[in-house]
């Protein structure tokens, strides 16, 4: 188990040694709060785009189902006739230049796995750059857009925003409620009181704290051909190799179990790069991975490898609320 994995386990399950990190946590909180205060007190330090910007992010380290929800937001806006673009940091990407416009045919190493997945699924204009304000400017120079979604970037205050959506894993919550490195929080818990909406992945119902959304499996897709298979493609009890290089791989393995399969889990680091040798497992069984991993494995995937396609399903109340926000932000287009 890596140091990062040990830390995550301690954050969510508790460990007395975390108290030794309290001085570093205090320093981290002071830096984060001072940085945020600087941007709030001087609006000139942030770039405000000529179109509304919606930030979709986390205050916790690790996976919360952000990419599926961004896909839902994109498709929902597109169904309403809105021209939507996306900016992303492009984590682990090595583009030839910055900012970099992501195309569906680009290799994952140029784009990052999540931006490439988003473009391949939706065709949306997407620009990557750690400087998200610069990414927005570049995107608007190329495309006439009505709305921009920022994939993550809640803490990137150089980009002014009109709406902040924060996602939390309902099962793990905020862990021990402490900031890095003593806990999983990028910002103090009080930050949740300042955002526009909180969404809980896996919650049974809406609460006063926020809206519920779920990730529902819709089918399997073969990597080598793109053929779609129904969820009953494998019978109940089928043993298979399960590959996940995401922030919370256990959630993927649990999902496969809810489909009555018997996954042999193979967890990799978030945003991991793969080689064919890494994915040679024994015994020979069907292999199922996440869609995020699939964009990096299509080039060498043999017949039979597939990914589980999921879709975000937000609560009716959130859909109504979000439509109201779109009408407020874009009154001429509603």
UniProtKB/Swiss-Prot annotation:
Molecular function GO terms recorded: ATP binding; tetraacyldisaccharide 4'-kinase activity
Reactions the enzyme catalyzes: a lipid A disaccharide + ATP = a lipid IVA + ADP + H(+)
SUPFAM superfamilies cross-referenced by the UniProt entry: P-loop containing nucleoside triphosphate hydrolases
GO cellular component, one term: plasma membrane
Keyword field: ATP-binding, Kinase, Lipid A biosynthesis, Lipid biosynthesis, Lipid metabolism, Nucleotide-binding, Transferase
EC annotation from Swiss-Prot or TrEMBL: 2.7.1.130
GO process terms (BP): lipid A biosynthetic process; lipopolysaccharide core region biosynthetic process
A UniProt-annotated Pfam family: LpxK
Coiled-coil positions: none
Enzyme class: transferase
Domain of life: Bacteria
Presence of keyword Cytoplasm: no
Pathway(s) served: Glycolipid biosynthesis; lipid IV(A) biosynthesis; lipid IV(A) from (3R)-3-hydroxytetradecanoyl-[acyl-carrier-protein] and UDP-N-acetyl-alpha-D-glucosamine: step 6/6
Binding site for ATP: 60-67
Function: Transfers the gamma-phosphate of ATP to the 4'-position of a tetraacyldisaccharide 1-phosphate intermediate (termed DS-1-P) to form tetraacyldisaccharide 1,4'-bis-phosphate (lipid IVA).
Family designation: Belongs to the LpxK family.
NCBIfam families: lpxK
Protein name stated in the entry: Tetraacyldisaccharide 4'-kinase
Organism encoding this protein: Stutzerimonas stutzeri (strain A1501) (Pseudomonas stutzeri)
Native organism taxonomy: Bacteria, Pseudomonadati, Pseudomonadota, Gammaproteobacteria, Pseudomonadales
């Amino acid at each position: 188990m890596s140091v990062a994995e040990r830390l995550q386990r301690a954050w969510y399950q508790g460990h007395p040694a975390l108290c030794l990190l309290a001085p570093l946590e205090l320093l981290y909180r002071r830096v984060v709060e001072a940085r945020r205060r600087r941007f709030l007190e001087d609006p000139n330090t942030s770039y405000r785009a000529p179109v509304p910007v919606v930030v979709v992010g986390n205050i916790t380290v690790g996976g919360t189902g952000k990419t599926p929800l961004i896909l839902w937001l994109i498709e929902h806006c597109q169904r309403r006739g809105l021209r939507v673009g996306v900016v992303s940091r492009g984590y682990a990407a090595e583009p030839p230049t910055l900012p970099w416009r992501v195309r569906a045919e680009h290799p994952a190493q140029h784009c990052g796995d999540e931006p490439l997945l988003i473009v391949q699924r939706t065709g949306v204009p997407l620009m990557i750059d750690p400087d998200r304000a610069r990414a927005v400017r570049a995107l608007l120079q190329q495309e006439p857009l009505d709305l921009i979604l920022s994939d993550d970037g809640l803490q990137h205050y150089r980009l002014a925003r009109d709406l902040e959506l924060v996602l939390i894993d309902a099962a793990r919550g905020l862990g021990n409620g402490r900031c890095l490195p003593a806990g999983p929080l990028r910002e103090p818990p009080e930050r949740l009181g300042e955002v526009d909406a909180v969404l809980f992945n896996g919650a049974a119902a809406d609460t006063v704290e926020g809206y519920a959304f779920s990730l529902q499996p819709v089918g399997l897709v073969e990597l080598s051909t793109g053929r779609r298979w129904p969820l009953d493609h494998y019978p109940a009890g089928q043993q298979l190799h399960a590959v996940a290089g995401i922030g919370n791989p256990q959630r993927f393995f649990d999902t496969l179990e809810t489909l009555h399969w018997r996954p042999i889990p193979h967890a990799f680091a978030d945003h991991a790069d793969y080689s064919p040798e890494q994915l040679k497992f024994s015994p020979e069984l069907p292999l199922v991975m996440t869609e995020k991993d699939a964009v990096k494995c299509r080039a060498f995937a043999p017949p039979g490898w597939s990914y589980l396609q999921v879709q975000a399903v937000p609560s009716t109340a959130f859909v109504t609320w979000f439509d109201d926000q779109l009408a407020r932000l874009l009154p001429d287009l509603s």
